[in-house]
């Protein structure tokens, strides 16, 4: 396999900083916003999460690929990251349920991987200087040319990427005789979200990002779900309008990550691009309604403006990130609507927040 071959490669950052490594398999160049994930496990779920579309992922954990790949752990129809940077890329994986090596899996997906990088130094650099555009390349003698190409790459701020990963056609998940019907807007939805809803008695119709309120309503849903997804939420004007329409319907609405941001935007509360974002499986969040803390899986580079959310008469902040105090959850005071800026479905990560799916079911029960 070509993923056992290694050629010299570089990680060139937007500010001109260069990190050296070796290309694992694919040659050429790959562009994207570089960021890092601190999770020690769950690489396959991370690579296939549509929320990472357009991003180069730096794995903070040392070993990648050492437990192979298993198709049931894909969170979408394929790899969504633009490239991978790691310290050690394992050619062989060992796990009873593993179907193939990660190298074989990524070779089929044609992903650009650079290994043998000092990821400890790279993660520290991104932490100190913020996420920025970068290029992975085997053109190690063409740095000036790569800099010119990199300069032409658009910033993540202002990019509407959800249309790139949304389904093209509506589809169904679950038992059509289930007690609850949920209309889900796919902005980059993860499969484990759908599994969690279906396991709790929901029959879900997943709609593309172009769906209208009339199309969602024709399904006669008991509630609406607004999914996670990549990019900047503010350019998604049609989705923001649709979000306001489903809120005005009076039916329960549950939003995760990008869906959470759309709910805030629909209420006039802006979002902003974070310096680094939150990407990992051990982020502490405090539930302000119960006083309890939970460890959560997070993946986002934008956040809801806390000061303006606090001033908004329709919004109550329900969760806060304990590391930096950013908004991690809200609910509306006048509607059965709530959302969180993290992933209660995990995949990967802890299950402390799985109660949020139960909360959605309870809201649909009480509003039937």
Regions found by a protein language model. Give the residues of each.
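Residues that mark the start of a beta-strand
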Residues: 179-183, 203, 252, 295, ...
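A glycine-centered loop/beta-turn motif at secondary-structure junctions
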Residues: 329-367
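RNA-binding accessory domains that recognize and position tRNA/RNA substrates
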Residues: 1-214, 218-219, 231-233, 347, ...
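Beta-strand-turn-beta hairpins that frame and shape the catalytic cleft
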Residues: 176-182, 290-293, 332-337
């Amino acid at each position: 396999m070509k993923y056992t071959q290694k050629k010299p490669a570089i990680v060139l950052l937007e500010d001109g900083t260069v990190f050296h490594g070796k290309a694992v398999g694919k040659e050429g160049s790959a562009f994207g916003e570089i960021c890092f994930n601190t999770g020690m496990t769950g690489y396959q779920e991370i690579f296939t999460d549509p929320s990472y579309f357009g991003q180069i992922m730096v794995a903070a954990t040392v070993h990648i690929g050492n437990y192979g790949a298993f198709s049931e752990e894909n969170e979408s129809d394929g790899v969504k990251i633009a490239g991978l940077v790691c310290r050690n890329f394992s050619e062989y994986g060992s796990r009873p349920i593993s179907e193939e090596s990660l190298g074989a899996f990524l070779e089929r997906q044609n992903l650009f991987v650079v290994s043998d990088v000092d990821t400890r130094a790279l993660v520290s650099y991104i932490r100190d200087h913020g996420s920025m555009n970068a290029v992975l390349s085997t053109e190690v003698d063409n740095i000036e040319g790569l800099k010119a190409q990199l300069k032409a790459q658009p910033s993540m701020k202002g990019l509407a990427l959800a249309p790139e990963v949304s389904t093209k056609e509506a589809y169904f998940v679950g038992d059509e005789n289930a007690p609850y019907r949920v209309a889900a807007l796919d902005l980059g939805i993860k499969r484990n979200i759908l599994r969690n809803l279906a396991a709790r008695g929901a029959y879900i119709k997943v709609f593309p990002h172009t769906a209208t309120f009339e199309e969602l309503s024709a399904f006669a849903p008991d509630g609406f779900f607004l999914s996670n997804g990549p990019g900047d939420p503010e350019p998604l004007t049609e989705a923001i309008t649709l979000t306001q329409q489903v809120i005005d319907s009076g039916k329960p609405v549950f939003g995760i990550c990008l869906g959470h941001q759309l709910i805030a935007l629909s209420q006039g509360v802006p979002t902003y691009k974070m310096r680094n974002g939150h990407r990992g499986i051990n982020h502490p969040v405090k539930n302000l309604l119960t006083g309890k803390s939970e460890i959560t899986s997070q993946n986002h580079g934008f956040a809801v403006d806390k000061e303006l959310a606090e001033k908004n008469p329709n919004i109550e902040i329900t969760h806060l990130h304990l590391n930096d105090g950013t908004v991690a959850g809200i609910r509306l005071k006048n509607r059965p609507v709530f959302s969180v800026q993290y992933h209660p479905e995990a995949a990967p990560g802890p299950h402390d927040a799985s109660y949020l799916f139960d909360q959605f079911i309870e809201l649909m029960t009480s509003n039937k």
